[in-house]
Amino acid sequence: MPSWLDDFLFTYGNLVHALGVNGLLALSMYVVLAVGQLSLGQAAFMGLGAYSSALMTLKLGWPFWAVLPLSVVVPVLFALAVGVPTLRLSGVYLAIATIGLGEVLRSIYLNVDYVGGALGLSGIPERANAFLIHGLLLLAVLVLWLVARSRIGRAMEAMREDETAAESMGVDVRRYKMGALLASAALAGLAGCLSAHVSSFIGPNEYGFEPAVTILSFALLGGIGNPIAPVFGAWVLTLLPELLRGLADLRLVVNGLIIVVAVLFLPRGLFGVPMRRVAARVRADAGASRAQPGARPT
């Protein structure tokens, strides 16, 4: 590794790690919003991934590379169990139900000594690194990009626009909803495992209501037009506190104002603005090329 890169990671390592982890969390929200669902269970799935991986490492002594895939399996199994009853709900009712599930898990973390209780778990081996985190983030973006441009992606878009119409066209709505929930759980669990193994500490308050809303804000700010958009939103909201560090207590106020403005005036997110401009330019160029000089109307 070049010395300058080593110095950069030593100085800004925590921020680089946060960019990757938050990018994965933004994708976990993207996949459920892509099918028109409002689930706020991503923080709960992240907590399951973090706690399961930390316990397997600390209590059982398992190596990180064995724990990493299992930290994805645990939240996926939980999502599979709770998905059947909760996916009967939609809109704000689904959001409330998933928040409730997250609070139940947080209460368990707080009150069970085996998982650290209110003090959390410390001394987790720091086995993850920036290259692994961002490599997995890039892989997730590529996979979701390909999915978005496949038959599955078109079905998801149809569900997001009009679930009833999509179902009438033969889209298996329940299957796609469950698939999106499981993918969301997998991505959030992966983010939890990576976060636990770079910070060496986890606590129950890291996976409550506030983190759930923050994850939602990643996708709202960036947009859900494609997988890159929510990652872009996550990076903006991750870097914003660093840029506003001098404002101290006003950082959260400014952060909230930016989210409100983005939702009101940028319904497709920040990433949608340049994409709309590019699309408009392409349409204008295409129209100009069709209008050949000297062509006479027929």
PLM features: residue spans?
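Transmembrane alpha-helices and adjacent helix-loop boundaries
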Residues: M1-T298
